[in-house]
C-alpha cells in the first residue's frame, strides 16, 4: 500500500514477492513450509503480511518494510543493514514464571502455543554471499575438480590443522548508545540472504562465561539489566579468526 512495485502472491507452493511490479518473483521461504496459501492480507498499521493456509493455520511476516527498499541495484552490495523501527520499551509479561519462547510450564503438552515476535529492537540485514570457513572455502574450490573427475590437491597437515583450529565466522551486530559506547554484541547467521536478529534491549549478563558443555540446565538464561530509553545505533560487522571487521 506504499510501494506499488512491491507485490505479494500466494501460490500452491508458498508465498512469493516481487519488487518489479510482477516481472520477477522471489520466494519467501523463511519459517514457512511448502504448502498452499489461499489468502493474503496486509495489516497496514503494523506493516505486517498475514497468509492463511486453510488447514494449517496462518503465518505472519512482521514488519515487511525492508522489502520496500529492495532493488536489483541494492542486492549488488556485499552487505546491507536496513533501517530499524523504533522499539517499545517495557517489561514483558511472564505467565507462570515462563521467560522463554515455547515454555508451557504446567499447562501440559496439549496446550497450544505459538511464538510471539521477539521482544526488543529487530535488526534486518542482507548478505550477498555466505561467510565460509577455510574448510568450506577449500571444499568449494575442490567441487569443480570433483565434478570434472579430476584429482583434488591434498591440503597438507599444516592447512588441516589451521582449518581445525579456526573459529567459526560470525556476523556481529554492535549496539552503541548516544555516547558511542558499546552496549551489546549480538551474533547473527552467516548464510546468504535476508536475516533478522533481535536485541532484547538489555546489557550483557553479568555472569561469567562458561563453555556450553559445562553449563547447567535451567529454565532461563542469565540476562543483564534493561538499557535506559534513548537513541541507539547498530553497526554490522563480520568476525573472522576472532577479529571484527565493520561492514556498515
Language model region names:
Residues 116, 166, 190-192, 225-229:
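Surface-exposed coil/turn segments at beta-strand junctions on protein surfaces, enriched
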Residues 182-225:
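Glycine-centered tight-turn motifs at strand-turn-strand junctions
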Residues 94-170, 196-198:
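Contiguous beta-strand segments within globular domains
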Amino acid at each position: 500500500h506504499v510501494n506499488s512495485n512491491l507485490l505479494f502472491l500466494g501460490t500452491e507452493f508458498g508465498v512469493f514477492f516481487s519488487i518489479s511490479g510482477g516481472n520477477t518473483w522471489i520466494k519467501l521461504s523463511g519459517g514457512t513450509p511448502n504448502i498452499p496459501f489461499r489468502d493474503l492480507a496486509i495489516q497496514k498499521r503494523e506493516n505486517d503480511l498475514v497468509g492463511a493456509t486453510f488447514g494449517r493455520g496462518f503465518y505472519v511476516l512482521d514488519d515487511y518494510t525492508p522489502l520496500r527498499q529492495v532493488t536489483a541495484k541494492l542486492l549488488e552490495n556485499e552487505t546491507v543493514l536496513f533501517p530499524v523501527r523504533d522499539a517499545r520499551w517495557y517489561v514483558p509479561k511472564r505467565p507462570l514464571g515462563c521467560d522463554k519462547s515455547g515454555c508451557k510450564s504446567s499447562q501440559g503438552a496439549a496446550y497450544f502455543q505459538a511464538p510471539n515476535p521477539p521482544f526488543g529492537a529487530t535488526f534486518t540485514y542482507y548478505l550477498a554471499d555466505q561467510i565460509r570457513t577455510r574448510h568450506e572455502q577449500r571444499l568449494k574450490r575442490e567441487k569443480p575438480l570433483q565434478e570434472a573427475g579430476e584429482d583434488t590437491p591434498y591440503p597438507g597437515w599444516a592447512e588441516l590443522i589451521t582449518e581445525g583450529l579456526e573459529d567459526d565466522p560470525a556476523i556481529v551486530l554492535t549496539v552503541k548508545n548516544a555516547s558511542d559506547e558499546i552496549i551489546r554484541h549480538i551474533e547473527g547467521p552467516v548464510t546468504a540472504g535476508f536475516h533478522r536478529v533481535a536485541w532484547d534491549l538489555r546489557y550483557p549478563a553479568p555472569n561469567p562465561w562458561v563453555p556450553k558443555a559445562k553449563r547447567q540446565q535451567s529454565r532461563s538464561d542469565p540476562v543483564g539489566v534493561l538499557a535506559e530509553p534513548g537513541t541507539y545505533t547498530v553497526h554490522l560487522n563480520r568476525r573472522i579468526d576472532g577479529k571484527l571487521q565493520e561492514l556498515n
